[in-house]
From Swiss-Prot:
UniProt-recorded name of the protein: Outer membrane lipoprotein pcp
Domain of life: Bacteria
Signal peptide annotation: 1-17
Organism: Yersinia enterocolitica
Keyword Membrane annotated: yes
PANTHER family the record matches: OUTER MEMBRANE LIPOPROTEIN SLYB, PTHR35603
Coiled-coil regions listed: none
InterPro entries: Bact_OM_lipoprot/Surf_antigen, Gly_zipper_2TM_dom
Length: 155
């Protein structure tokens, strides 16, 4: 009974780390963005700053659950009687905390904060994943926007 549960927990944690966060960059588009009309404006980069983009804490739940199951299983293999129960509980708590920390580290990606002076004189700030294209101050850029989403690309 416990072995299938552990296998499912490990698979869930592993697959959660495979989530595609490439749509955060200006070089990758989601399927829903394809063939959609976007407004295009142009501008010049005023500043470029490297940042880290952290995924939401709700994404760490699978890591915590997987870690707790694995930690509880390992704790259950220690001792007997009351000692085994305490080891199981301690293993589940420690495993949950470790799993959440590992999942949190996997949810981080390198990004870039771009301050852009648009040709109309307004200044905006955009954070997006750092793609293969490197940005530099003074560079002309294209801004493709749809709703509140803006993607910055080199011109």
């Amino acid at each position: 009974m416990i072995k299938p549960l552990i296998a499912v927990a490990i698979a869930a944690v592993t697959l959660t780390g495979c989530a595609n966060n490439n749509t955060l960059s200006g070089d990758v588009f989601s399927a829903s963005q394809a063939k959609q009309v976007q407004t295009v404006t142009y501008g010049t980069l005023l500043s470029v700053r490297p940042v880290t983009i952290q995924g939401g804490d709700d994404n760490n739940v699978m890591g915590a659950i997987g870690g707790a199951v694995l930690g509880g299983f390992l704790g259950n293999t220690v001792g007997g009687g009351t000692g085994r129960s305490l080891a199981t509980a301690a293993g589940a708590v420690a495993g949950g905390m470790a799993g959440q920390g590992v999942q949190g580290a996997m949810n981080r990606t390198d990004g870039v904060q771009l301050e852009v002076r648009k040709d109309d004189g307004t200044t905006i700030l955009v954070v997006q994943k750092q793609g293969p294209t490197r940005f530099s101050v003074g560079q002309r850029v294209m801004l493709a926007s749809s709703g509140s989403t803006v993607t910055v690309s080199p011109r």
